[in-house]
Swiss-Prot record:
Name by which UniProt lists this protein: NADH-quinone oxidoreductase subunit N 1
Keyword Kinase: no
Catalytic reaction list: a quinone + NADH + 5 H(+)(in) = a quinol + NAD(+) + 4 H(+)(out)
InterPro entries named among the record's database cross-references: NADH-Q_OxRdtase_suN/2, ND/Mrp_TM
Family affiliation: Belongs to the complex I subunit 2 family.
Organism (species): Symbiobacterium thermophilum (strain DSM 24528 / JCM 14929 / IAM 14863 / T)
Amino acid sequence: MPVDLNFTIAAPLLALAAGALLILLLDLLFRYETIQGPMYVAAVGAVLVAGWYLVPLWRGAAEPFGFHGMLVMDRFAAVYGLVLLGAALLAILLSFGRVREDQSGYLALLLWAAMGMVLLGGAGNLMVIFLGIELLSLALYVMIAFAPKRMAAREAAFKYFVLGSVAAAFLIFGFALIYGAAGTMSLTGIAAAARSFTSEGAWSVGLYYKVGVGLAIVGLAFKMALVPFHIWAPDVYQGAPTPVTAFMAIGTKAAAFAAMARLLVAAVPQAYQPSFLLPLSILAFASMMLGATVGIWQSDLKRLMAYSGIANAGYLIMAIPGLGLDGLSAAAYYLAAYGFATMGVFAVVRILEADGVDGSQLANLKGLFYRSPWVGVCLAVLFFGLIGVPPTGGFVGKFLLAIAAVRGGAWIVLTGLILSTGISAYVYLKVIGTAFTRTKVAPQPEEGEEPHPPTRTAAQVVLAIATAGTLVLGVLPGPVSELLRVALAGM
């Protein structure tokens, strides 16, 4: 068999890996005082270089297949890869100002997690999907615990590790059953086998195959925090350092969705997807309703965003039943809008933390508009985006998902979207109202905490980018949506 080494399509992954190794070498060879800035420059540079290499793949200018079909860096992979790299870039900026002893390891792990996420979008083989899941998971397990003084972070990391290991077992067992039924781990081969199961208008697939696909969906649903596999999310979001929570909220959801789309496009013929994937639609409905409803009683902003993420995972599943061009482009658009809004909210938390205040407590948001008017306005815009109020990207994203659901006949998830949006509007408006409530006493810094202006400045930059992105996606939906449709037309 001839060697099929297409390093052109592997370049984005290699750039991230090289950046991580460079950061570790800088820490090994030079004094910390001289390389703090260069480490962040190296991390940002690695992400930008990886994005640069994805652009030709977006344009379709390079052969997307390599390594005997195990890696498929086509336009689909490029679209989701750019979304993931954008999340990684903003997370690096949010991380500026971490304590001395963990900077190099933290940044290297962040790049390796991003590498695993991008790999999932370009997976052409079941084992590559598993490799991507494990690469991002192992990095995140450690990143969550990167808060030496906080026992909550260690507890969150342990919970995520234990439950993540169980989810990985479901995933690999499902892959084993699919392999046994289809006789191949290649997604292309699985697609051919799935079509061969069709006879006389019926899909006569075996039980092992159905169970295998179901178990694989369970493993990926855990990463997306779909009900009932969401139990880890609130505690992990609350306990993890804020930049890690922000990165997880966007990155794991986007990467797991990309892998799920890859798998289901291959494993289930499109004509049979609405009926075969009905249980997934029910899980999506449950996720929307639980995420929106339980958020009402939250007093911690990070836990609130965890339940928001659960609901938004359900929204993404609206693109699954048809898995056509409309669904995939709508999901990519909504992920970008959700990513900007979510990253911006966590930037506000980070700004408060830079002032020595516990930014995750909703009570500390009281009077935010009067202490910092532009931060308060940005927070309002971001939550309007999460609700889906025009002219924000969230409105356009939900509208496109609704269209995809109607065309795919997914009435269950469409009903969930309408009901949960109304409930979550109450939750998010309550947060906005808190920020615009006058108070005579400003929140005081916690004991032992001191203001850190550089961290605040970096978080303000992220907040400005996130707010601008939310508005641009709402004001100029046509060009962006058409660009995504063109890019995903060959999926």
